[in-house]
Every structure is written in structure tokens, then in C-alpha cells.
Swiss-Prot record:
F-type ATPases have 2 components, F(1) - the catalytic core - and F(0) - the membrane proton channel. F(1) has five subunits: alpha(3), beta(3), gamma(1), delta(1), epsilon(1). F(0) has three main subunits: a(1), b(2) and c(10-14). The alpha and beta chains form an alternating ring which encloses part of the gamma chain. F(1) is attached to F(0) by a central stalk formed by the gamma and epsilon chains, while a peripheral stalk is formed by the delta and b chains. This is ATP synthase subunit delta. GO terms for molecular function: proton-transporting ATP synthase activity, rotational mechanism. The gene is atpH. InterPro entries: ATP_synth_OSCP/delta_N_sf, ATPase_OSCP/dsu. Pfam families: OSCP. F(1)F(0) ATP synthase produces ATP from ADP in the presence of a proton or sodium gradient. F-type ATPases consist of two structural domains, F(1) containing the extramembraneous catalytic core and F(0) containing the membrane proton channel, linked together by a central stalk and a peripheral stalk. During catalysis, ATP synthesis in the catalytic domain of F(1) is coupled via a rotary mechanism of the central stalk subunits to proton translocation. This protein is part of the stalk that links CF(0) to CF(1). It either transmits conformational changes from CF(0) to CF(1) or is implicated in proton conduction.
């Protein structure tokens, strides 16, 4: 995606978040995700050969929502031929919601599967580290790490894996 499209998607997400009540943002995001999944890669909605009016009619009949803000946003995207930005708008809106709720999303990679107690301990540690109210952690297994954890957030990568430590040691010994 071009940087100008990312900037434009960010502007749409800012407009959405400023027009909606903060408490309604999570449900708004969920509805947009559902709509994005429903229209997916449909050539109908993205084809320049299909008139805007037909796209709007099809979207209106397919939408389960009565949310005025969602309908108008989608119609505006269709009018401006920017429906392809919906995925990025959802990503940006999710980041906005996370900042409002002081939530951090993290991918946690570990060499072996962790039980619930271990996962909760990692989540509590991340809450303290990031001074966050909530942590959305996605735990994944990566056997190449040997042991330890590797944590990725939007802004940070924390690598406490044995694999990383061995690579650092190798680098030091080679220098």
C-alpha cells in the first residue's frame, strides 16, 4: 500500500473515532471487520466497471447494520473509490481503541507451549513493563528459539530467547 493511502486511511480512522462515542468504538470496529470479511476480495465492489450506485445498493442490502456512521463511511469510500482502504482503516481504528483503553497487543513466541498459568504470568509481566491496563497476547510456538521468549508489539521487539543470546555471543566471538 502506498504511503499516501496509509495516510488517507489514518485520516478516515481518526474521523470515525472522533464521530463515534468512545464506548461504541469496539462494536464499530467489530462491525467493520465483519463487513470487510464479507466483501473480501469481491471483484464487484472493487471493479471500476460497476457503477457506484450499484455498489451502494448491493452494500445496503447486504449490510446487517443500521449504524449510520458505518453506512456513510462505506458510501464515502465507494464515492471516492477508496474501498480498498477499509483494511488499513480497521488497523488504524484498532490502534486508536488500544490507545484509549491503554491496551497493548503482543505476539509472544516461545519454544514450547505454555499452560494458562505461565501465559497469565507473562501477561502480568507485560502489563507492568508497558504500564498497560490490558494485554492482548497471541501466544505462538517457535521451536527454533531453543528456550525463552520473543515478544513483538507494534513498537518493540523483546528477544530473550536462547537463540538470540547465542547469536549475540557468536557475533562477539567473531569480532
Amino acid at each position: 500500500m502506498k504511503s499516501t493511502d496509509r495516510i488517507l486511511a489514518h485520516k478516515y480512522s481518526i474521523a470515525l473515532s472522533s464521530l463515534a462515542d468512545k464506548k461504541d468504538l469496539p462494536s464499530l470496529l467489530a462491525e467493520l471487520k465483519e463487513i470487510h470479511l464479507a466483501i473480501g476480495n469481491s471483484s464487484f465492489f472493487y471493479s471500476p466497471a460497476v457503477p457506484k450506485k450499484e455498489k451502494k445498493q448491493a452494500l445496503s442490502s447486504a449490510l446487517k447494520t443500521d449504524n449510520f456512521l458505518i453506512k456513510n463511511t462505506l458510501f464515502l469510500l465507494i464515492d471516492n473509490k477508496k474501498l480498498n482502504l477499509l483494511g488499513q482503516i480497521i488497523i488504524d481504528l484498532n490502534k486508536t481503541i488500544e490507545s484509549f483503553t491503554n491496551t497493548v497487543s503482543a505476539e509472544v513466541y516461545c519454544a514450547r507451549e505454555m499452560d494458562d498459568k505461565q501465559q497469565n504470568a507473562v501477561i502480568e509481566s507485560l502489563k507492568k513493563y508497558f504500564k498497560a491496563n490490558f494485554i492482548n497476547a497471541d501466544f505462538k510456538q517457535d521451536k527454533t528459539l531453543i528456550s525463552g521468549l520473543k515478544i513483538k508489539t507494534a513498537d518493540y521487539v523483546i528477544d530473550g530467547s536462547t537463540k538470540n543470546n547465542l547469536q549475540k555471543l557468536k557475533q562477539v566471538l567473531q569480532d
